[in-house]
């Protein structure tokens, strides 16, 4: 072996070692988070317990890994959830509210129970005819995310460039899109912005696969879920706190449903202008909120994760969206200055998309619901109100064919299950090959 061959071989080994170390570093970031107790997070941020009603952080710490030498961002592709909103319909509030009214009619409320009922009346009045509407907090979340995008990637959003925005035909998504676009325009008036909300794009913007949905709660999944939740539902302490004779009101108050939906009512309030009034949330202990999180987290995994209890296919509900993202990117990267493509939708799209991509290990496959917490499958971290996945593309100039892509989950660098020697950057050719193969295999098995 010549000296040149030895040097080349050594260089290659160092490159592979560096890639392995970087991949391990980014994986450990995720594992480090999962090592924390969820209860500790909930004690600081009770909204975390509500899973898909979690609050988007007021500030995000930017810790950006420098791209390989000469590479610069040139295109952004994105899918984001609408911002904070009111509860979609009054049913979730009516369940605990009507139970409390019935107990009150029987004179069975304690002084604490009477105070809680007054708080519930206040929330019901504030929410009436606002079901599902975006709140002022929701608008601000998208303005802030847009500002951050410009601040971090001025190469993409500076000067006279194009921003194409699409949303589902749901009002809160359209308003989220409008808030973000207005903020971008205010920062850079030269932007060429177009917005669209059309039924023609709903096939990939908000695809709800009926066949997959039918197979979510298989007998095996239902048995496992019921066993998992049996030891976590209910709240005798709460019943004794609010009702004079819990045994009597047991006939009109379903303990498990009451506990669950009263918690939701209090936590949802954190998204509205009543967010300074945390009385309903404060009546629950951190452990009680934690148990509710466990119940919800397991259900979201069954419904949208790669859960072995129902075949592990649920993330493929977003196969059309992923194909569209790939096709759009392939088209855009041919341009000298492709700009930005933003999409605004829902958490029932974003969560399975994250699982389909395997971002930060969310492609976890298990039939043991007790594994979720220790493995770091925490849905609250994926889809708070305003959550987003950003694909940032890099190259040296428009002639550069070696395009790289980096993924941000809620504005933080994330990992993918793809080999790379420059994590968290991945070759676009590898990205395409990996995911198109995955999607094609699924289509063949259908």
Name what the model sees in each region.
Residues 36-162, 168-341, 345-446:
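Signature for phosphate-centric chemistry
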Residues 1-38:
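Bacterial Sec-dependent N-terminal signal peptides
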